[in-house]
């Protein structure tokens, strides 16, 4: 079939040969077709077969039966390994679909990271792209949102691949019928209480669904080109305007910031907040633009919080500082064999031979700033978001920056920190 031939070319372009890959499989027609196509491609290219991952949200009575179908049918299709990931939901309020979607991707990417799988395949297709565009247009999304989904993106450190984006729902159905594939029908896909169903029906009712879908997808490509150009200039602006400090915060030089076009300046502020907060999702636009407008009013004092960050005007700069109360403490047993990630801003190496359980917490918990930190010429609020090693609630070790490390004897404990913010910026925005 033509679809199969085109799919093989797309897969070859992804260059995932001999790497372990996983496929998110709901049991619906799209993901079953994707699994069949990838299994066939892997066999022809003599690559390892894909791993099938099925998420059980437990929201419908038939959920368990559907994920069990995925496991059994994947085996029929030649898949050697399949896993069911269960969502342990608690106190669901508000938009259930949105929370289920977020949980699904967290479960999938977490499994991939824990099992050294770097590529996760998703069965989004051309009709999904058009529906997503209309949904985001209604919500008032900016250019990034309207550019919709890409063939390749990154989430939680996992590469997400969408090889079906070029194919319509009708072509996928023809493929499934040709190979007599089995799938389950999710009745909630027909429910009019969901906006996506309304837009799906709107496209059908247009009388020229295929042409309209094609035009919408073409529009998303135009927007994507524009956003890539904006990101190019945002990266250049980071080089001129931003200092990423070893103490885990970002400084934006206002003299350079004020010279930027507003869209570039807004993006620079946005990505600075996202990388310090360690959140993959953008803050609400209304909250972000309110802070941005305050920053643009040159005589204004800026003293705001957003997404677990403090945004402060300090001298001739804007500082993006982690909010200490939002930092999660972690408990570890000493001695450690390897560095440990803390708050997604620091890699902490704890040296010493003591055998004990300790907590790595924000310095704010001690209510005390050690004298050596006061030698740093920066806003004192920065110090409270730094790590400190506690044993039984008492300070066992303060931090040392990697370039300040010193030799210690076996009885001492030392916490050496390296900022990971620059690496995270590269992952987040290619900066």
From Swiss-Prot:
Binding annotation for ATP: 26-31
Q: Which family, according to UniProt?
A: Belongs to the tRNA(Ile)-lysidine synthase family.
Write down the EC number: 6.3.4.19
Which function does this protein serve?
Ligates lysine onto the cytidine present at position 34 of the AUA codon-specific tRNA(Ile) that contains the anticodon CAU, in an ATP-dependent manner. Cytidine is converted to lysidine, thus changing the amino acid specificity of the tRNA from methionine to isoleucine.
Q: What is known of its domains?
A: The N-terminal region contains the highly conserved SGGXDS motif, predicted to be a P-loop motif involved in ATP binding.
One biological process term from GO is:
tRNA modification
**What domain of life?**
Bacteria
Which subcellular locations apply to this protein? Cytoplasm
- Pfam families associated with the record: ATP_bind_3
Protein's name in the database: tRNA(Ile)-lysidine synthase
**UniProt keyword annotations, A-Z:** ATP-binding, Cytoplasm, Ligase, Nucleotide-binding, tRNA processing
Q: GO MF annotations for this entry?
A: ATP binding; tRNA(Ile)-lysidine synthase activity
The record's GO CC annotations read: cytoplasm
Name the gene behind this protein. tilS
HAMAP family referenced in this protein's UniProt entry, alphabetically: tRNA_Ile_lys_synt (MF_01161)
SUPFAM superfamilies attached here? Adenine nucleotide alpha hydrolases-like
């Amino acid at each position: 079939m033509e679809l199969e031939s085109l799919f093989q070319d797309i897969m070859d372009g992804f260059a995932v040969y001999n790497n372990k890959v996983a496929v998110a499989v709901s049991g619906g027609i799209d993901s079953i077709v994707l699994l069949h196509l990838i299994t066939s491609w892997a066999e022809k290219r003599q690559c390892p077969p894909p791993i099938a991952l099925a998420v059980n949200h437990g929201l419908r009575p038939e959920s368990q039966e559907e994920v069990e179908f995925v496991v059994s049918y994947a085996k029929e299709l030649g898949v050697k390994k399949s896993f069911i990931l269960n969502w342990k939901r608690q106190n669901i309020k508000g938009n259930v679909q949105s929370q289920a979607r977020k949980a699904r991707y967290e479960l999938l990417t977490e499994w991939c990271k824990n099992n050294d799988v770097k590529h996760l395949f998703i069965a989004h297709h051309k009709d999904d792209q058009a529906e997503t565009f209309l949904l985001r247009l209604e919500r008032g999304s900016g250019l990034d949102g309207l550019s919709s989904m890409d063939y390749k993106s990154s989430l939680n450190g996992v590469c997400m691949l969408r090889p079906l984006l070029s194919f319509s729902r009708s072509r996928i159905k023809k493929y499934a019928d040709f190979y007599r594939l089995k799938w389950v029908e999710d009745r909630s896909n027909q429910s009019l209480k969901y906006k996506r169903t309304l837009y799906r029906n709107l496209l059908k009712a247009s009388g020229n669904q295929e042409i309209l879908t094609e035009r919408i997808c073409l529009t998303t490509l135009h927007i994507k080109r524009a956003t890539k150009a904006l990101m190019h200039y945002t990266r250049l602006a980071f080089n001129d305007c931003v200092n990423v400090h070893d103490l885990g915060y970002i400084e934006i030089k206002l003299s350079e910031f004020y010279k930027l076009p507003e869209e570039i300046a807004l993006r620079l502020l946005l990505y600075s907040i996202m990388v310090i907060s360690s959140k993959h999702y953008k803050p609400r636009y209304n909250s972000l633009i309110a802070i941005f407008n305050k920053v643009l009013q040159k005589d204004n004092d800026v003293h705001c919080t957003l997404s677990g960050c403090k945004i402060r005007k300090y001298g001739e700069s804007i500082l993006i500082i982690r909010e200490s109360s939002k930092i999660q403490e972690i408990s570890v047993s000493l001695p450690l064999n390897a560095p440990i990630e803390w708050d997604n801003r620091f890699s902490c190496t704890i040296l010493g031979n003591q055998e004990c359980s300790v907590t790595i917490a924000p310095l704010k918990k001690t209510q005390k700033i050690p004298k050596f930190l006061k030698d740093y010429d920066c806003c004192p609020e920065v110090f409270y978001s730094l790590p400190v090693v506690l044993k039984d609630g008492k300070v066992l070790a303060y931090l040392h920056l990697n370039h300040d490390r010193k030799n210690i004897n076996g009885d001492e404990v030392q916490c050496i920190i390296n900022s990971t913010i620059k690496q995270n910026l590269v992952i987040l925005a290619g900066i």
